[in-house]
């Protein structure tokens, strides 16, 4: 006789519903954009009721914010994973930046993070989510390069803010001119790096 599957707890069912909504919304927002995706389409894709969406998130905007946070978290993990393959702090910084720019060309990141994020949430709320995932790791990478003598010493956090803003703009520009955006970022990074005779 087949053994019965253990019944899921209410908490497990709730988490499964929430995850299904986030997964469905992520795919649809990446494909159609926030404004082109009615809530009914999300719940249909997720296989849940409209009541479940409003119970877990309150409204479509709150669902979008959860989607944005999940996409940003995956992006930060990708950047960190790419950076870890570098042999020294500077190479890790370069590899992380390159991975960030590659990701910005993908529909999920481009549409959800760069385009709809600021317009749906407003710049301040979007920036809090975006910087929350990327600012301190970028500042830490810069600080490591400074300690290694590869970047002139200065407060790393303000420098990270400027560089993150430049990367966001480069990600937006990449759709029209990916090579030009990548070249601009490489040029910017070369200006940060100290020449061997300056060390």
Predicted region positions:
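Basic, helix-initiating cap at the start of DNA-binding domains
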Residues: 1-32, 36-45, 62-65
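Short hydrophobic/aromatic patch on the recognition helix
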Residues: 46-57
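Alpha-helical DNA-contacting segments of helix-turn-helix folds
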Residues: 65-71
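Hydrophobic alpha-helical connector segments
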Residues: 66, 80-108, 159-163
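Amphipathic alpha-helical packing segments from all-alpha helical-bundle domains
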Residues: 73-76, 95, 123-148, 157-161, ...
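Amphipathic C-terminal alpha-helical segment
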Residues: 102-106, 139-140, 144-147, 161-179, ...
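Amphipathic alpha-helical segments used for helix-helix packing
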Residues: 104-124
């Amino acid at each position: 006789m087949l053994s019965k599957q253990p019944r899921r707890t209410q908490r497990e069912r709730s988490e499964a519903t929430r995850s299904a909504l986030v997964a469905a919304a992520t795919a649809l927002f990446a494909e159609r954009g926030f404004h082109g995706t009615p809530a009914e389409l999300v719940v249909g894709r997720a296989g849940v009721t409209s009541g479940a969406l409003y119970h877990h998130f309150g409204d479509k905007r709150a669902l979008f914010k959860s989607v944005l946070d999940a996409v940003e978290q995956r992006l930060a993990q990708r950047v960190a994973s790419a950076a870890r393959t570098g042999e020294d702090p500077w190479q890790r910084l370069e590899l992380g930046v390159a991975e960030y720019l590659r990701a910005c060309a993908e529909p999920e990141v481009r549409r959800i993070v760069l385009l709809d994020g600021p317009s749906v949430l407003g710049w301040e709320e979007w920036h809090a989510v975006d910087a929350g995932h990327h600012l301190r790791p970028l500042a830490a990478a810069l600080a490591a390069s400074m300690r290694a003598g590869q970047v002139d010493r200065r407060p790393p956090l303000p420098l990270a803010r400027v560089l993150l803003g430049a990367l966001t703009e480069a990600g937006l520009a990449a759709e029209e001119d990916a090579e030009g955006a990548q070249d601009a970022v490489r040029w910017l990074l070369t200006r940060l790096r100290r020449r061997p005779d300056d060390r």
